[in-house]
């Protein structure tokens, strides 16, 4: 259900291969720390269509919004400039490392890192799915989620899309 909901939030149709790949990633969430540049790029490559796989943080300006009519977009958010991403992401990763050794509650840790990540939108595609994956990753790695269990993060967000998009 979590995999299906994660794709459904973004109105992305999925197939068995994409679903299986995402399930395999979710199974790694409790075993590996994905909050470093190389792992985030690898994660992005695994969850997006291969045509949209990145080899680094994005190099063009990104916007979050919606199509309101043909060739008409409503911009909700202008992401940080590409030239700022390396330092912003390095700061986020350093903060993750500090929180991991500083006794910060896993829910606060996961929330701060996931929000920081989606705020920066470092990739052209996959940022929302990665942000939700990071919640699972941090909660599992720091012992908040019981082994073998997964909280329905995406399913909960899907229940109230207006709040999720706010």
Located regions from the model:
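FIC/Doc superfamily catalytic core
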Residues: 1-166
């Amino acid at each position: 259900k979590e995999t299906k909901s994660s794709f459904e939030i973004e109105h992305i149709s999925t197939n068995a291969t994409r679903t299986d790949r995402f399930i395999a990633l979710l199974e790694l969430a409790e075993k590996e720390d994905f909050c470093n540049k190389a792992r985030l790029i690898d994660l992005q490559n695994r969850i997006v269509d291969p045509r949209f796989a990145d080899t680094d943080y994005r190099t063009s300006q990104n916007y979050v919004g919606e199509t309101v009519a043909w060739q008409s977009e409503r911009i909700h958010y202008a992401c940080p400039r590409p030239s700022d991403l390396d330092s912003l992401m390095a700061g986020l990763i350093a903060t993750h490392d500090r929180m991991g050794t500083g006794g910060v509650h896993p829910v606060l840790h996961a929330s701060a890192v996931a929000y920081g990540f989606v705020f920066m939108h470092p990739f052209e595609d996959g940022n929302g799915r990665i942000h939700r994956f990071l919640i699972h990753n941090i909660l599992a790695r720091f012992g908040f989620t019981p082994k073998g269990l997964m909280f329905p993060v995406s399913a909960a967000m899907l229940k109230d899309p207006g709040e999720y998009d706010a």
